[in-house]
């Protein structure tokens, strides 16, 4: 009886971890330096969801993979908001990916959503909206310059 209880507890913990991973829209694939999600420090495999804000301190970097296999690379001093994200491979007409680039530099390699319908992908940088018509983009935003223009 004693050996069954620890096994059951371990199975429950594994199941809870797996369910959390399945419900995530993406995750931190790897990172270096001070990287935060909603103000909290990340760890390897930190789960990401719609409406999360990801911030990299100067000199830091992060690689994010979303559930459609698109990849976002953030350089140091960057901040993005996953403003909308939905991926269902069996209903591609409902898929959407919208990212607001608040500061810094983002590199993007497209995944399944862009392949199925590029109109379902957009990036907002300041007053600009960027659509994807290829498989790779790089965007830099300087929020100080944007404020000076207003």
Language-model features, listed with the residues they occupy:
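N-terminal signal peptide c-region/cleavage motif recognized by signal peptidases
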Residues: 16-18, 23
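Flexible, surface-exposed loop/linker segments and immediately adjacent secondary-structure boundaries
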Residues: 24-53, 57-150
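Bacterial N-terminal signal peptides that target proteins for export
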Residues: 1-10
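Sec-dependent N-terminal signal peptides of Gram-positive bacterial secreted proteins and lipoproteins
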Residues: 11-15
């Amino acid at each position: 009886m004693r050996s069954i209880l620890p096994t059951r507890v371990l199975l429950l913990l594994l199941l809870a971890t797996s369910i959390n991973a399945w419900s995530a829209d993406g995750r931190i694939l790897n990172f270096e330096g001070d990287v935060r999600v909603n103000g909290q420090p990340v760890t390897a495999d930190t789960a990401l969801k719609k409406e999360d804000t990801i911030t990299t301190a100067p000199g830091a970097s992060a690689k994010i993979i979303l559930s459609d296999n698109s990849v976002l690379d953030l350089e140091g001093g960057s901040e993005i908001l996953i403003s909308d994200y939905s991926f269902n491979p069996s209903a591609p007409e409902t898929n959407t990916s919208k990212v607001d680039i608040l500061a810094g530099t983002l590199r993007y390699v497209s995944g399944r959503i862009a392949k199925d319908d590029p109109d379902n992908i957009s990036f907002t940088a300041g007053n600009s909206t960027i659509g994807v018509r290829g498989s790779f983009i790089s965007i830099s935003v300087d929020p100080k310059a944007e404020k000076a223009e207003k």
